[in-house]
């Protein structure tokens, strides 16, 4: 932010650029899995990530930084679609929550390094740091497994998409991911600015991000297993209720250490909802690699739609009316979502993962 001299609104645009790229790549990634298979999709996504990481490291203008983050979102969406469809298509439905939780947890553990990289880049420069990160991605690409489910000869992505859109579980999961993207993007665009206003530096921001990611990784692993056994809605309801209570108070917290603790708690709770929400979508999708790729594509699109719009709107509201308003709206969105989940829970009972083994007609 300081290196590129970005305003509050420009920070919101930079945060939104990544999910905007994810949104753009959602449907193409689904088609790529359908035609070329999960391994080729993963390889293509990582390749795009490598190129865009170098661009972000050496870019100097706000426009180039936004473009690099946008392309990173494209690469991330493609790689995630291939990798997660690879995992879920080879896993029984009763264990998909655990598998998704492990995958999301592993990704978040990797993201713990991100704030440290950001703090290091602020000291030695973005170019060398992000070039080293690109080399790490190359190593991961070369070390990937060589075998994967072959692409299906029949192009079934359209039919799988139609079935998923008619699934109540899929609709609920994607709606929740939209909320997660909106609220998470709001926090990531505004919390660093709140820290700066309280005279906190890059180290404090990096610590908030790192601890949040680490806690969220642990929560995702736990909630994946919990949701396989007790259903997807109960942990989602509890998490939304906690977030609704914490979010409105964040901008009025004055001591920096209190802001640190509450921000970490709120962000880790929001991020932990990824697993039960994604498991709902996976339950509603077909079990084949193409069907699961469709599920991942809609997950990406739903999360990205919120993640792209939330930061920009939140930053604009913060500029126009101050920080309390966007945080209050984010808390209200979580509260409204909790009511919807509660009504679904009371209407049909907890939909356990075992129910997802029923025929697709019964799940609609």
Model-inferred region functions:
Residues 1-8, 189-203:
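Short amphipathic helix-loop junctions that connect adjacent transmembrane helices
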Residues 19-27, 111-112, 213-221, 307-308:
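Residue-level signature of mid-helix packing/kink "hotspots" within the transmembrane helices
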Residues 134-153, 340-345:
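C-terminal membrane-cytosol helix-exit motif in multi-pass small-molecule transporters
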């Amino acid at each position: 932010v300081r290196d590129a001299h970005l305003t509050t609104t420009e920070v919101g645009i930079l945060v939104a650029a990544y999910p905007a790229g994810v949104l753009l790549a959602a449907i193409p990634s689904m088609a790529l899995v359908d035609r070329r298979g999960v391994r080729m999709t993963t390889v293509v996504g990582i390749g795009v990530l490598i190129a865009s990481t170098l661009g972000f490291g050496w870019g100097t203008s706000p426009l180039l930084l936004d473009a690099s983050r946008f392309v990173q979102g494209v690469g991330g969406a493609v790689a995630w679609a291939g990798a997660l469809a690879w995992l879920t298509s080879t896993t029984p439905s009763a264990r998909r929550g655990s598998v998704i939780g492990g995958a999301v947890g592993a990704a978040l553990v990797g993201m713990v390094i991100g704030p440290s990289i950001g703090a290091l880049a602020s000291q030695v420069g973005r170019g060398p740091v992000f070039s080293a990160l690109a080399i790490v991605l190359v190593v991961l690409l070369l070390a990937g497994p060589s075998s994967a489910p072959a692409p299906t000869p029949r192009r079934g992505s359209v039919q799988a998409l139609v079935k998923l859109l008619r699934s109540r579980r899929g609709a609920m999961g994607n709606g929740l991911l939209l909320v997660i993207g909106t609220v998470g993007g709001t926090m990531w665009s505004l919390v660093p600015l709140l820290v700066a206003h309280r005279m906190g530096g890059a180290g404090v921001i990096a610590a908030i991000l790192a601890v949040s990611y680490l806690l969220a990784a642990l929560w995702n692993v736990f909630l994946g297993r919990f949701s396989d056994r007790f259903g997807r809605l109960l942990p989602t309801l509890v998490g939304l209720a906690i977030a609704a209570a914490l979010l409105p108070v964040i901008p009025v917290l004055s001591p920096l250490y209190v802001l640190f603790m509450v921000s970490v708690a709120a962000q880790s709770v929001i991020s932990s909802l990824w697993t039960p929400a994604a498991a709902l979508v996976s339950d509603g999708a077909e079990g084949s690699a193409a069907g699961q790729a469709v599920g991942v594509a809609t997950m990406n699109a739903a999360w990205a739609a919120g993640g792209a719009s939330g930061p920009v709107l939140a930053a604009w509201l913060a500029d126009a009316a101050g920080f309390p308003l966007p945080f209050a709206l984010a808390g209200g969105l979580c509260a409204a979502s909790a009511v919807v989940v509660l009504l679904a829970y009371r209407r049909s009972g907890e939909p356990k993962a075992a129910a997802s083994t029923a025929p697709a007609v019964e799940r609609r």
